[in-house]
Amino acid sequence: MVLMIVSGRSGSGKSVALRALEDMGFYCVDNLPVVLLPQLASTLADRNISAAVSIDVRNMPESPEVFEHAMTQLPDSFSPQLLFLDADRNTLIRRYSDTRRLHPLSAKNLSLESAIDEESDLLEPLRSRADLIIDTSEMSVHELAEMLRTRLLGKRERELTMVFESFGFKHGIPIDADYVFDVRFLPNPHWDPKLRPMTGLDKPVISFLDRHTEVHNFIYQTRSYLEQWLPMLETNNRSYLTVAIGCTGGKHRSVYVAEQLADYFRARGKNVQSRHRTLEKRKQ
């Protein structure tokens, strides 16, 4: 497991980096005192979770020896890595002017320029032992997040998770949906007394819907639409794409179609999840 320590001058992008690491599955803590690093790592060791912690000038130890000692106290299962973010002086000044935020050292009655310079001196012990230094002067927020994914995961884009969820319109449209498809016009197994108690996961219902050409046409056109735009969605700095399929009650048609779409994209190597809102409510 990795303990990623994120540091750098204020305004260089530590918060952006921490959010990107969280998207990559790291357990993230902002501004944790250095002396608590071993305790955090020990807590997470049994859960097999990598962690990322930001350290700025406000929680820097008084001497480098304190930091070194904390590193020696980490569980053997954790491999510490130090990421240091920086930007040139003019860029940091411009970013502070744009956001109108106070520098952490402004309480010492320093000018912004002096605060930036003093912070550089205070953080030098961390910078000198960094495993990776990234200059964010010419980077946008998205470019920084992309670079971290490339460096840490070895691939350019994060893996998009496709979520296919069924629902019933009479229960309301899911608020987390990126796309909503209405399948209430498809043949309805509800009107067959034998199929009515079943769901779209049961073989008799699957066989019923599988006999209808219009069902296959809808699934084909929907998956073709998603396939056409999926490459752009994957590069749009998002973690999830939620596709909601709705029928009247969320029990038969929407469940079947959601499962068919999920199976199709799963077979093509995509990271896919499926869930059925109405069926989950019935289990509760």
Swiss-Prot record:
Keywords: ATP-binding, GTP-binding, Nucleotide-binding, RNA-binding. It holds the Pfam family PapZ_C. Coiled coil: none annotated. GO terms for molecular function: ATP binding; GTP binding; molecular adaptor activity; RNA binding. It comes from the Bacteria. Transmembrane segments: none annotated. Residues 266-284 are annotated as: RNA-binding. GTP binds at residues 56-59. Homotrimer. Modulates the synthesis of GlmS, by affecting the processing and stability of the regulatory small RNA GlmZ. When glucosamine-6-phosphate (GlcN6P) concentrations are high in the cell, RapZ binds GlmZ and targets it to cleavage by RNase E. Consequently, GlmZ is inactivated and unable to activate GlmS synthesis. Under low GlcN6P concentrations, RapZ is sequestered and inactivated by an other regulatory small RNA, GlmY, preventing GlmZ degradation and leading to synthesis of GlmS. Belongs to the RapZ-like family. RapZ subfamily. This is RNase adapter protein RapZ. It comes from Yersinia pestis.
